[in-house]
Regions:
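Catalytic-core signal marking the mid-to-C-terminal active-site face
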Residues: 2-29, 65, 71, 293-445
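Proline-centered turn/helix-capping motifs that create local helix->coil transitions or kinks
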Residues: 104-110, 198-199, 280-283, 318-322, ...
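Active-site-adjacent "gating/activation" loops or surface patches in catalytic cores
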Residues: 223-247, 251
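Generic, well-ordered alpha-helical scaffold segments in large soluble proteins
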Residues: 42-47, 98, 102, 137, ...
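Short amphipathic alpha-helical segments with heptad-repeat character
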Residues: 135-143, 147-150, 154, 184-187, ...
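Glycine-rich anion/phosphate-binding loop at the beta-strand->alpha-helix junction
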Residues: 193, 240, 246-332
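A helix-coil-helix interface module used to build multimeric assemblies
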Residues: 2-213, 220-232, 294, 307-309, ...
Length: 445
């Protein structure tokens, strides 16, 4: 069976491939191999720039050609690495051998080949490649999509800034609010957590077999290898080196990133559920696309499926993100291998997250405001002005105002404009205060 969108086991690469293809250059097997090649090449170049005595004679004009090994890396190259791995049964060693083959193609580089992967362990490559892929995926794909969602919400918040709406707390009518303000709450929350995510450190482990640069020191004790590692990781990869590690990354900062994404996802779940409710309450209608079907049995239905799709995908994403954040920082002694297979899944929750963001955006762009229904609900819920009345009465030192309004409103009788105004007329306050109270409506409170 040929692997394609119909035969893929995961819906990320199957049904939703069109939405997640943007992540393939960061989290696919091909992408991981390319990132490994990139780190190996940049490390070799940095050794030449040091320079190690044996690399002083390396022609720096070849650096451009070396960088083309990863900048022009294609699927055929990745397939070659996989073929080598069938023999080595080791993915990172296969990358090293592939680069040596590429050196042979350039020619004249035989004396320098053993400085590929010099003094390193596999995790020096993996624990730089993976955070680098996350960094670039966030910058190139995730942040722009979240920004697009925030922008759409901000447009609605501005457009509907002065649209009054009945609030609901505990599912019951509460003091009126403005539709634009309620949407602005989500803009604020998302911006806050997006800033928090952007402020998370992207760190890398780079320090040899057990984090001590043992091999580097024994071969070249005259160099400050910690300073070298700091410079390489920051200048060549744009990451921050973890100063104290075992064989692998501590993963603490990566856990912070996963937790931050999970908080953003949780906010979007909250948003999805609220807009689902607003549609159910008929505050919004949905644009209908010719040919689409809402239910296989009920022809009249236009379901809020985009919000439901988003909520489901975010639930999956958050479960995996929580697992990653909890599992990765835990490893037996100086390392066990459990992080290796787990790290291969870092793209999965981001895949479900971008599916969700796109679904939420799709749902938002279908909205048609039903101001008539919002106005109707306000007209039918005059009891909500009770808070305003009792607060003004408190200002006027009126005796027991809260209790008076409670006695009026907590009955089974319907509260309307007439009921409220009749009550106001009975109050022992000045005519000016009565006029002030009479002017309050569910629409302007």
């Amino acid at each position: 069976m040929t692997l394609d969108t119909l035969t893929a086991v995961s819906p990320i690469d199957g049904r939703y491939r069109s939405k997640t293809e943007c992540l393939a250059d960061y989290f696919s097997e091909y992408a991981l191999i390319r990132y490994r090649v990139r780190v190996e090449i940049e490390y070799f170049i940095t050794l030449c720039e040091l320079p190690l005595p044996q690399l002083k004679s390396f022609d720096s004009s070849l650096f451009k050609r070396l960088r083309e090994i990863y900048s022009k890396f294609d699927e055929n190259d990745a397939a070659r690495v996989k073929d080598i791995e069938k023999i080595t049964n080791h993915d990172v060693k296969a990358v090293e051998y592939f680069i040596k083959e590429e050196f042979d193609k350039i020619g004249g580089l035989e004396p320098y080949k053993e400085f590929i992967h010099f003094g390193l362990t596999s995790q020096d490559i993996n624990n730089t490649s993976v955070p680098l892929s996350i960094k670039e995926a966030l910058e190139d794909v995730y942040y722009p999509q979240v920004d697009e969602l925030i922008s759409q919400l901000q447009d609605y918040a501005t457009e509907w800034e002065n649209v009054p709406m009945l609030a609901k707390t505990h599912g019951q009518p509460a003091s009126p609010t403005r539709l634009g303000k309620e949407i602005e709450v989500y803009v604020y929350r998302l911006n806050e957590q997006l800033t928090s995510l952007r402020n998370c450190k992207l760190t890398a482990k780079f320090g040899g077999a057990t984090g001590n640069y043992n091999a580097h020191h024994v071969a070249y004790p005259q160099y400050d290898w910690k300073a070298f590692g700091d410079r390489f990781v920051s200048e060549k990869l744009g990451l921050e080196r973890e100063l104290w590690t075992t064989q692998i990354s501590n993963y603490d900062h990566l856990g912070s990133i996963f937790d931050a994404i999970r908080r953003i996802n949780t906010i979007i779940i909250d948003l999805d559920r609220d807009f689902w409710m607003y549609i159910s309450m008929e505050y919004f209608k949905q644009k209908i696309k010719a040919g689409e079907v809402g239910s296989s049995a009920m022809p009249h239905k236009v379901n809020p499926i985009d919000y439901e799709n988003s909520e489901g995908n975010l639930g999956i994403a958050n479960a995996i993100l929580q697992f990653l954040a909890q599992k990765l920082p835990v490893s037996r002694l100086q390392r066990d291998l459990t992080d290796s297979t787990v790290l291969r899944n870092v793209g999965v929750p981001l895949g479900h997250s971008v599916i969700a963001i796109q679904s939420t955006l799709k749902g938002l762009r279908k909205l048609i405001l039903n101001e008539e229904k919002l106005s109707e609900d306000l007209d039918n819920t005059w009891a909500v002005v009770a808070e305003a009345i009792q607060t003004i009465l408190r200002r006027e030192a009126y005796p027991h105002p809260y209790e008076a309004l409670k006695a009026l409103t907590r009955t089974n009788k319907k509260m309307n404009e007439e009921t409220i105004h009749e009550f106001i007329k009975t109050l022992n306050v000045s005519d000016s205060v009565k006029a002030e109270l009479m002017a309050i409506t569910p629409h302007n409170y």
